[in-house]
Amino acid sequence: MSFESFGDFLAMGHHGPYVWSAYGISLLVLAINVAEPLLARRRYLQEEARRLRREAQQ
């Protein structure tokens, strides 16, 4: 499938809003799937460090 111009490419034969929003939502979900475990690990390590400091003080 070839397009006459970049504008035609973005419009995708009048399906552009659906196509680009689907790509955007997919990328958002992928980013969340990558970021969430990293953030959860960071929170877990911070909580464990806090717990170990409390136990060391007792």
UniProtKB/Swiss-Prot annotation:
Compartmental location: Cell inner membrane
Recorded GO CC terms: plasma membrane
Transmembrane segments: 19-39
GO biological process, one term: heme transport
InterPro entries: Haem_export_protD_CcmD, Heme_exporter_D
Disulphide bonds in the chain: none
Topological relation to the membrane, as annotated: Single-pass membrane protein
Principal subcellular localisation of the protein: membrane
Superkingdom, taxonomy of origin: Bacteria
UniProt keywords, alphabetically: Cell inner membrane, Cell membrane, Cytochrome c-type biogenesis, Membrane, Transmembrane, Transmembrane helix, Transport
Keyword Transmembrane helix recorded: yes
Entry similarity comment: Belongs to the CcmD/CycX/HelD family.
Purpose: Required for the export of heme to the periplasm for the biogenesis of c-type cytochromes.
UniProt xrefs under NCBIfam families: cytochro_ccmD
Name this polypeptide is given: Heme exporter protein D
Organism field: Pseudomonas aeruginosa (strain ATCC 15692 / DSM 22644 / CIP 104116 / JCM 14847 / LMG 12228 / 1C / PRS 101 / PAO1)
Gene name, Swiss-Prot/TrEMBL: ccmD
